[in-house]
Structures are given as C-alpha cells and as structure tokens.
Amino acid sequence: MVRIVYEEGLEAIAKRIAQASSGDIVKLENAMEAPGVLEEVDSIGLVYCKCGKDISDRMVRFIKEGLGSIELKGLEYLFSICVCEGSAKPQYALKVVNRLCSQIGCLPSYSKAVSSDDKTLEEICRDVSKESIRLADGSPFIGLYMKANKKRFKEA
C-alpha cells in the first residue's frame, strides 16, 4: 500500500498521485501526531513545498522525528515530490530531503519536482504507479548503498 504524506495546500496534488498508485493520503500534521500510520505500508511518498531554496521546518522535523521514529523494515520504497511554482529550481530542496532521509536510514528511490503544470504531474503519476520505480528507477545503487551501510530496508 502507498501512503502519501503531504503539506498543507498540496492535497490536490497528493490525491492525484495517490489515485494513480491506488494509495491514500495523510496530512503532515496528522502523520506527526501519529507516525504509526506509516508502519503498515510498503511505500511512502512525501509531497512538500519548496520554501526559498530549502524545505519547510515542518517537513524537516517530520523526516527526523516522524519517519526516524518508526520501524521502516517493511518499506519497499520511498519517493519524494517537491512542488515549486514557476521556473524555480528544486535541486537543493530535493538534495536536502535525500540527505535527511539517509540520516534516518533510508533513501528516496524516486525524487522529482512538479509545478502546477499538468504534464509534469501526469508523468509523476505514471512513474509512481509503475512497478519499475520499486527498483529505484534513476538511482540503481540505492539498494547497494543501504545494504553496505546497514540502512533500514525491507529484508529480501
């Protein structure tokens, strides 16, 4: 099951991605109050805003304290969607999420930016709904990294 954690104001985007992947959504604040809602899922998606060139303090706290406090052994994959408007460059925000996730023992297998452009969102929905994303599409060495560094991931 896919569960998508989204920041306030991004519910419509999170719902579209969840529908494409037959998953459901949880507001960031609710996931912070009860991080256990993420323990029984095999896939977690993070949908967050780019704030300046960084991500919000709420999302930083959620990754460190929320995701970091639960058992991720059942997690098959984690994906990260950065929402930015206009021609903003999201690379730094995506790197921040990757770094924070690696500190708690996991890495997103898929990271992408989306704007209000439907074409980009449709591409993300298509990618997330594919089974091939579970193989860390675009980042083929994530599994090796996690094993070599004894990171938390689903046991084979």
Please provide the spans of the model-predicted regions.
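FMN-binding flavodoxin-like domain, especially the glycine-rich phosphate-binding loop
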Residues: 2-12, 16-29, 33-156
